């Protein structure tokens, strides 16, 4: 991770400095509700992000953000705070094999850190 200031260097721990962007916090976050590996997909990792002044879906994204870290966190790679009049968009292409689901099972997308309002698009449909 790129460090932007001498103060920011103090915020990193040994673990933060050595984080693997392709393998970020892959364990299931609630040990008492642990899922089988074939029924759980962790969405942590690199996503595209965009800050916008409009609630319209952006055409272009500003760059990459490392999830699960918030944009303000140095480990996110963004180091920017969302302003009150802005919207924050994330985008990532994820492929799931729906055929793996049994007839009586459900497909659930869980976001553990949505603070306000969230709109989810699947195959471009809200």
Set out the residue ranges of the language-model regions.
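Short glycine/threonine/proline-enriched tight-turn/helix- or strand-capping micro-motif at secondary-structure
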Residues: 25-30, 73-77
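Short, compositionally biased strand/turn segments
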Residues: 24-25, 47
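Core domains of carbohydrate- and sulfate-ester-processing enzymes
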Residues: 38-87
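A generic signature of intrinsically disordered, low-complexity regions enriched in glycine/proline
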Residues: 24, 40, 68, 76, ...
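Accessory beta-strand-rich segments of carbohydrate-active enzymes
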Residues: 2-20, 33-35, 48-54, 80-126
């Amino acid at each position: 991770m790129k460090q932007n200031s001498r103060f920011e260097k103090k915020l990193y721990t040994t673990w933060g400095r050595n984080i693997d962007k392709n393998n970020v916090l892959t364990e299931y976050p609630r040990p008492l509700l642990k899922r089988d590996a074939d029924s759980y997909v962790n969405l942590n990792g690199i996503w595209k992000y965009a800050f916008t002044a409009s609630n319209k879906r952006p055409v272009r994204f500003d760059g990459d953000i490392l999830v699960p870290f918030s944009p303000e966190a140095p480990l996110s790679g963004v180091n920017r705070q969302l302003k009150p009049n802005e919207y924050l968009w994330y985008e990532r292409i994820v492929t799931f094999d729906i055929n793996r689901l049994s007839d009586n099972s459900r497909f659930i997308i869980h976001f553990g850190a949505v603070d306000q309002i969230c709109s989810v698009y699947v195959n471009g449909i809200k």
